[in-house]
């Protein structure tokens, strides 16, 4: 709590020593949080089951990389990771601007420090990962089997890294409101920090989609699950924010758009944590959590959101020079982009929160599924593609390479969505060793069953040979795993691909002597979806690199 006080005092009294003290405080806070996270990680690596959190989420036979993923595999560790990464962003901001005298920078640090203080208070009071038990547990309960996947080593850190960068950008916007001026210079700083945050969030969403495709066993890459939507919502607002800031930093227009989108992105980043960690929404990713945490989490979200909106309503001034729209100008196309993103955001927000509101009113339980989201967002998605084409080919100015790369990624993503949906073929059937089935011109032959014991689970692995016109082109090895510590059975799909086609096999329950249920899929274009996301990130990073060179 001392850091925001020294920051505000330094601005108010114009005392450089206070500003230096603020930077030192933020750097010290990051160092202490890094130490705390390092200690927690060490407890996992040595299987210290005297720590309740370790005993609940780890197992002595886990590999070291899965023990690392287990550090943020539960509520307490993931929140500590989020606070650590937000502190890292704050320390980087403080170090980068340590020589600046503009009040914008200490005010930004003050806003960041207030949010960090609130989050740390929640961690200490309701989410302490270091609570111990004596005598220690003999063995841990193991990591949730759904989370025992390489993608989960990087997926949560990338999401929190993205949230942190976007919260820094929002803090710059809030600091500019406290200062009483949001101009092109402020927008450039906001854009510079929003861009890497958006890139990290995009990478995290891509990894999460890949994990869902590889792990959940239904052959799809996006389920419109509340937890998935929790990361999509700030991504939508942040994407709109980057487009708005591109005009604000260059021409000083769309200031109110940029300010409001920065605040909305902050609110949605906090809402994502509320959705994921409060246990108030049913999710395929759901964890067994104490709903007592929902009240302080919601209070924290409401406090920061209302304070940010109140500050905007109090201090927002004229939105910059008037915007004159003429034909298919860049301004008109970006305004259309902002409106379309806001429409999709509203659709996803309503579909995600409606079940929660319905339940809180005592009307029962319900879920909003993929048909609603697909049908409601499809028209706006098609309009976005039209706007992208117009922005690329109709604008009279030379197309910038970063925008071209990012928009090519959007088009590749859209092509992947369409092709994978149209080409998908599937079949469910029972097979025993020696039997085969043909799907989409490919033959799947169940050859044998391999029983294995690996680390923290035992496995029944089917060997399924894959043939194309009598020529063997590979094999699939779907599994049924049994995790002893949790007494839980999981299906582990097997996927083979050649750059265009994906062959996907899932082995289900035993239905008779040497007979098992199988689900088989053949589809094309799925990898284009993730390739499109990577192109978007490449375009964003290229834009940031060019912008940095231009500023220098």
Curated annotation (Swiss-Prot):
Its main location: membrane. Keywords: Cell inner membrane, Cell membrane, Cytochrome c-type biogenesis, Membrane, Transmembrane, Transmembrane helix. One of its GO terms (cellular component) is plasma membrane. One of its GO terms (biological process) is cytochrome complex assembly. The keyword Nucleotidyltransferase does not apply. It is a multi-pass membrane protein. InterPro entries: CcmF_C (IPR032523), Cyt_c_assembly (IPR002541), Cyt_c_biogenesis (IPR003567), Cyt_c_biogenesis_CcmF (IPR003568), Cyt_c_biogenesis_NrfE (IPR003570). Pfam families: CcmF_C, Cytochrom_C_asm. One of its GO terms (molecular function) is heme binding. It comes from the Bacteria. The chain crosses the membrane at residues 26-46, 77-97, 105-125, 158-178, 193-213, 228-247, 256-276, 294-314, 333-353, 376-396, 399-419, 525-545. It is found in: Cell inner membrane. Disruption phenotype: Triple nrfE-nrfF-nrfG deletion mutants no longer attach heme 1 (covalently attached to 'Cys-122', the CWSCK motif) of cytochrome c552 (AC P0ABK9). Belongs to the CcmF/CycK/Ccl1/NrfE/CcsA family. May be required for the biogenesis of c-type cytochromes. Possible subunit of a heme lyase. PANTHER family: CYTOCHROME C ASSEMBLY PROTEIN-RELATED, CYTOCHROME C-TYPE BIOGENESIS PROTEIN NRFE-RELATED. This is Probable cytochrome c-type biogenesis protein NrfE. It comes from Escherichia coli (strain K12).
